[in-house]
Amino acid sequence: MDRHNHVVFSLSKTHDLVSRICQKLKMPMGLITHNEFADGETYIRFEESVRNKDVFIFQSTCAPVNDSLMELLIAIDALKRGSAKSITAILPYYGYARQDRKTMGREPITSKLVADLLTTAGVSRVALTDIHSDQTQGFFNIPVDTLRTYHVFLTRTVELLGKKDLVVVSPDYGGVKRARLIATSLELPLAIIDKRRPAHNVAESINVLGEVANKNCLIVDDMIDTGGTVIAAAKLLREHHAKKVCVMATHGLFNGEAPQRFQKAFNEGLVDYLFVSNSIPQTKFDQCPQFQVIDLAPLFEEVLLCYANNSSISAIYTRHIEWIKKHV
C-alpha cells in the first residue's frame, strides 16, 4: 500500500488487531485523539491530514454497542469534513445485525437504521465480517463487501482434528447456508441440529439430522452470545455418541454467564475446543487451553491490499481453500 495515498486508522475496539495489520503492511497506523467529555460526549480528532487520501477505518461496534457505534459515526464525519477522497469503514463485528427484520408489530429494523446512519455520516464503502444474515447487504445504498473468515479458522481446526471422520454441524436451520459452504469447500459431510427458541437467549436442541456417531463434530456459527445454542448442540451431539465436539464462531460476545457455561462444558467434556476470532477483544477466558483465538490480521491485510490494488477479494478464499486441501 502507498502510505502517501492510503491511511489506516483504528478506533477503540480494534486497536490491537489493527496494530498487527499495520505491522504486516509495514506502514504506520494513523494517529487519533479520542477523548470523552465530563458529560459522556465523545470527541475525536485525526492528527494527520486525510485530504484526498483513501482512508480505511476499523471499528467493532461491540459492547458498549451504542458508544462504539457513535464513536464510528463521529470519526466518519470528521474524515468527511477533512476532505478524505474515500472512506472505507471496516467492521470486524457489526452490532445490531440480529435486528434485521420485524417478528412482531411495532418493532424496529435496527440493522437498517444503523446502515442509514453510516451512509448519512459519509462513508463510501463498508466491509462487514461474517454478518448474521445476508440481507444486511441490502440495507446499504453504497458498496458493501461481506468478508468471510471460515478459511482462516479451517487452517487451525482441520489441522487439529484432521479431515478423517470430520463432520460440519449447523447448530440451527438459520446457519445451514454457512455450514454447507464450509462442508462443500472441503468435501465434508453436513449435520444439522433441529432447534427451537421459546424466548430471547433461550435455545432448546431437539434432534440431529445427519450421522455424527464416532465422528469429530465441528459446530459452526457466526456468533456466540450467551452460549446456550452451541452448548445445547454439543450436549445433543454427545448424546448421539460424537467422538469430539469443537465449536467455531467468528464473533465471541460471551455475555452474561457464557464464560462460566463454557468452562463447565470444558470440565464436563461436552466441548473439546472453542475457537473464536479477535473481531471482538477477548478478555473473558484466562489461560484456558480449550479456548483459542484465531487472529484475523492476515485476512484484513490481504483485504486492504485488494482495496489498494483494485483486485478481487473472492480470490483470497479460493487460494486459501486450495492450500488447505493440499497441506492440511
UniProtKB/Swiss-Prot annotation:
Necessary cofactors: Mg(2+)
Protein name per UniProt: Ribose-phosphate pyrophosphokinase
Similarity-based family: Belongs to the ribose-phosphate pyrophosphokinase family. Class I subfamily.
Complex formation: Homohexamer.
Active site: K195
Pathway: Metabolic intermediate biosynthesis; 5-phospho-alpha-D-ribose 1-diphosphate biosynthesis; 5-phospho-alpha-D-ribose 1-diphosphate from D-ribose 5-phosphate (route I): step 1/1
Catalyses which reaction(s): D-ribose 5-phosphate + ATP = 5-phospho-alpha-D-ribose 1-diphosphate + AMP + H(+)
